[in-house]
């Protein structure tokens, strides 16, 4: 994944991306490790603050609950004592039972990876897309259900209202084969606008 090549291509194909880059500056290439822990962490982080997610994750690590075998042998009460809700305890067990071949995933198409991951209870399309983008470094994936991306696109493209998931997915086709970098740029632009002008 070459950020410089991608941003040059996007700027040449869409002048508004060039304008956004002038505001955001160069985009960092932030990749995270792939594997079981990354997906488990994504489940833990769903619908709670970063601080709360970090606190729960640290308790889980201390208890050994980042290992699928230990999670499977633990009672729901033990998992809940580490801070997981009843629902997330079930999701953690479902992910542990899924026995995903994480090395094998790397060889699949992005579409097939997303299909594989979303078969697991607790992993939706957004979580799978973020995993493919940030843990596997795929260049042509776009999380069109992400509210920040939708709002950033509304502001950057001067749209009358925030585009819905399907509308943004259609828009993003024009940014292929660098849709993941377009997403990174839109997130950076969202943060820029939010910090300077206020964003609803």
List where the protein language model places each region:
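Alpha-helical ds-nucleic-acid-binding substructure associated with the helix-hairpin-helix region
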Residues: 16, 48-49, 53-121, 174
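Short amphipathic alpha-helical interaction patches enriched in hydrophobic/aromatic residues
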Residues: 43, 75, 79, 99-100, ...
């Amino acid at each position: 994944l070459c950020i410089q090549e991608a941003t040059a291509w996007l700027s040449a194909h869409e002048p508004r991306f060039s304008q956004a880059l002038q505001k955001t500056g160069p985009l960092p290439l932030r990749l995270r490790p792939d594997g079981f822990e990354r997906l488990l962490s994504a489940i833990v982080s769903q619908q709670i603050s970063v601080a709360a997610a970090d606190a729960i994750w640290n308790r889980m690590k201390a208890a050994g609950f980042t290992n699928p075998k230990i999670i499977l042998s633990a009672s729901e009460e033990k998992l809940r004592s580490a801070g997981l809700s009843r629902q997330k305890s079930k999701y953690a067990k479902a992910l542990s039972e899924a026995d995903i071949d994480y090395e094998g995933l790397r060889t699949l198409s992005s579409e097939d990876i997303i299909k594989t991951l979303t078969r697991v209870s607790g992993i939706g399309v957004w979580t799978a897309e973020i995993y493919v983008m940030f843990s596997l470094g795929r260049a042509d994936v776009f999380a069109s259900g992400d509210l920040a991306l939708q709002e950033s696109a509304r502001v950057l493209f001067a749209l009358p209202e925030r585009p819905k998931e399907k509308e943004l997915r259609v828009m993003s086709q024009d940014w292929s084969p660098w849709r993941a970098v377009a997403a990174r740029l839109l997130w950076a632009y969202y943060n820029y606008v939010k910090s300077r002008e206020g964003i609803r």
